[in-house]
């Protein structure tokens, strides 16, 4: 499964080769197709497994009573990190699958994709944005953090010795910076203070 994620992450569904998978896994193509029938079957299985595994990690990492946005984001990243400790290419694979444009692949994973999106929506829906003056800005800040995290992940994956724990530590630094920016945006600027 981890090998398949790695290959699919690098190549996407369209360009992923079953020849590469069987060569790297040291299994026969017959055995691969015995269990999965075709490339789409392998892709759907790996996607399904990845989402279920990630959701399990999120369910243990995210406190159901937490309402602080930045703590929720940290807990989500903790769950992702735990998942990537088992399967280093899990999150990059899921990120790449989000951008997939092959119709048959999209249809094959649509239900699980929806389940994952709903899980994230449920987590972030309970975030209390009321303590920030500009809640819309905090939503944009969260989107900016998601893109930053994906970018960091893409950079670190290219390194030969990818370590999810080191990526996690770097992500926490960015989350702390974002918290400070959001909290600062809720306070009046120097200009607003002098005008009063």
Feature roles, as predicted:
Residues 36, 95-102:
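Short helix-capping/turn signature of helix-turn-helix
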Residues 2-6:
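Short, small-residue-biased leader/transition segments that mark boundaries at the very start
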Residues 10-41, 45:
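Helix-turn-helix
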Residues 91-96, 106, 127-175, 185-196:
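Hydrophobic/aromatic-rich alpha-helical bundle segments in the mid-to-C-terminal region
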Residues 52-60, 67, 71, 82, ...:
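Amphipathic alpha-helical packing segments from all-alpha helical-bundle domains
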Residues 36, 42-62:
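Histidine- and aromatic-rich ligand-binding microenvironments
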Residues 11-14, 65, 87:
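Short coil/turn segments at alpha/beta junctions that flank glycine-rich nucleotide-binding fingerprints
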């Amino acid at each position: 499964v981890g090998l398949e994620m790695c290959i699919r992450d690098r190549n996407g569904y369209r360009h992923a080769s079953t020849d590469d998978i069987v060569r790297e896994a040291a299994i026969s193509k017959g055995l691969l197709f015995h269990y999965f029938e075709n490339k789409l079957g392998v892709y759907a299985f790996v996607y399904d497994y990845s989402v279920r595994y990630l959701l399990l990690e999120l369910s243990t990492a995210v406190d159901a009573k937490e309402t602080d946005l930045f703590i929720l984001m940290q807990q989500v990243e903790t769950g992702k990190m735990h998942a990537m400790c088992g399967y280093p290419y899990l999150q990059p694979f899921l990120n790449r699958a989000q951008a997939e444009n092959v119709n048959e692949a999209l249809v094959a994973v649509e239900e699980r994709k929806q389940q994952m999106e709903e899980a994230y929506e449920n987590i972030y829906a309970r975030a209390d944005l009321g303590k920030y003056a500009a809640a819309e800005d905090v939503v944009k800040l969260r989107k900016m953090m998601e893109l930053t995290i994906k970018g960091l992940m893409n950079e670190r994956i290219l390194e030969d010795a990818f370590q999810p724990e080191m990526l996690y530590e770097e992500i926490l630094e960015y989350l702390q910076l974002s918290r400070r920016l959001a909290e600062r945006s809720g306070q009046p600027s120097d200009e607003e203070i002098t005008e009063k």
